[in-house]
């Protein structure tokens, strides 16, 4: 079982981790709704046009009564070099796509590149299910080959759904 961490130190050019709590990593290409999913989970209002995440944002939450660090990775190509180091120690990795054919194919490439660094359980969120032409979660799952849940991160009525998904997947990771 992977260890869980909250803090990363850079010492003598090497990353060191301090184990303290559960860790969930959220990754995907830019503009797929990773930060919106995190805002939805945390109970914040969702901005219609959110600024892209720069590098990495880490927030704490409580899932299943346990403290959990949620790592929201910037999806721009210039930040992806950090992913392999920051994926270490995750108990759950959530791959987010925007449910379009083009994005799913690019997500599959990215996932393939970084999957060797993942020691955690991996799921996908097929976000933006509310948009015309969105592929269903089942279609996305067939293309990615990992358990996939449909979502629309801008729908406040789905706040409980993202929480239930993460809590279920964390518990089933034991």
What function would you assign to each model-found segment?
Residues 65-80:
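Switch II (G3) loop of P-loop NTPases
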Residues 75-76, 101, 130, 155:
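Short, glycine/acidic-enriched loop or turn micro-motifs at the edges of active sites
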Residues 132-174:
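Canonical P-loop GTPase G-domain recognition
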Residues 79-101, 111-117:
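Inter-motif core of Ras-like GTPase G domains
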Residues 21, 66, 89-92, 118-122, ...:
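Short glycine-/polar-rich loops that comprise or flank the Walker A/P-loop
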Residues 2-49, 62, 68:
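Conserved G1/Walker A P-loop phosphate-binding module
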């Amino acid at each position: 079982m992977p260890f869980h961490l909250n803090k990363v130190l850079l010492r003598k050019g090497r990353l060191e981790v301090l184990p303290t709590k559960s860790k969930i990593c959220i990754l995907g290409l830019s503009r797929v709704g990773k930060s919106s999913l995190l805002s939805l989970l945390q109970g914040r209002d969702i901005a219609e046009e959110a600024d892209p995440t720069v590098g990495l944002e880490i927030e704490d939450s409580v899932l299943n009564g346990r403290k959990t660090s949620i790592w929201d990775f910037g999806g721009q190509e210039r930040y992806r070099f950090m992913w392999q180091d920051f994926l270490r120690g995750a108990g759950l990795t959530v791959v987010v796509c925007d449910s379009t054919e083009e994005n799913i194919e690019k997500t599959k490439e990215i996932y393939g590149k970084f999957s060797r660094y993942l020691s955690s359980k991996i799921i996908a969120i097929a976000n933006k299910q509310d948009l015309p032409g969105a592929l269903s979660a089942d279609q996305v799952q067939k293309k990615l080959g990992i358990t996939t849940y449909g979502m629309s991160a801008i729908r406040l009525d789905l706040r409980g759904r993202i929480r239930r998904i993460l809590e279920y997947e964390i518990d089933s990771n034991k």
